[in-house]
Regions:
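Active-site-adjacent beta-strand anchor residues
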Residues: 30, 67, 95, 137
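Short amphipathic alpha-helical segments
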Residues: 16-18, 41-42, 76-79, 103-106
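General beta-strand structural signal in soluble alpha/beta enzymes
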Residues: 48-49, 92-93, 115-119
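Rossmann-fold dinucleotide-binding core
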Residues: 3, 74-77, 98-139
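Beta-loop-alpha module in the N-terminal Rossmann-like domain of NAD(P)-dependent dehydrogenases
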Residues: 52, 64-80, 98-101
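NAD(P)+-binding Rossmann beta1-loop-alpha1 motif at the extreme N-terminus of oxidoreductases
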Residues: 1-62, 85-88, 125-128
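ADP-ribose/adenylate-binding Rossmann-like module
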Residues: 66, 82-106
Length: 139
């Protein structure tokens, strides 16, 4: 499976690493700072250094997974996914967002013809070893 994860903080980085190491998935890793992307590439992911490249590197229908903190930064990233994505792409919010924010984002994504998953992630940085718990809702 091909999965794009944007946000190579502690959670996003280790999730990408686990998907490559233990799941044999093609992972496209994106982050605003290139050092984090370079580190993900060393661990087997494919790097993307801009949101445009992140979207372009994936075949449609894409999995556009945001692993950014809840709040404004997540809103801005989802706006970019909607702007650059194609009908049928799947947008995933991995932040543990306030439910009303998730409802608002879901409506925006669906209105653009994309699919939505709210997938708050738990498991901390040790999730690489033992796996992650995701609380998923959406399309």
């Amino acid at each position: 499976m091909e999965i794009g994860i944007w946000g190579m903080g502690r959670m996003g980085f280790n999730m990408a690493r686990r998907l490559v190491d233990k799941g044999d998935h093609r992972v496209i890793a994106g982050n605003r700072s290139s050092g984090k992307v370079d580190e993900a590439v060393k661990n087997g992911a494919e790097g993307s250094y801009s949101v445009e490249e992140f979207v372009e590197k994936q075949a449609s229908p894409r999995v556009l997974w945001s692993m950014l903190p809840a709040g404004d930064v997540t809103d801005k990233m989802i706006d970019r996914f909607v702007e650059l994505g194609d009908e049928g792409d799947i947008v995933i919010d991995g932040a543990n967002s306030y439910f009303r924010d998730s409802i608002r984002r879901a409506e925006k994504v669906r209105n653009a013809g994309l699919r939505w998953l709210d997938a708050g992630v738990s498991g901390g940085v040790w999730g690489y070893e033992v796996g992650y718990c995701t609380m998923i809702g959406g399309d």
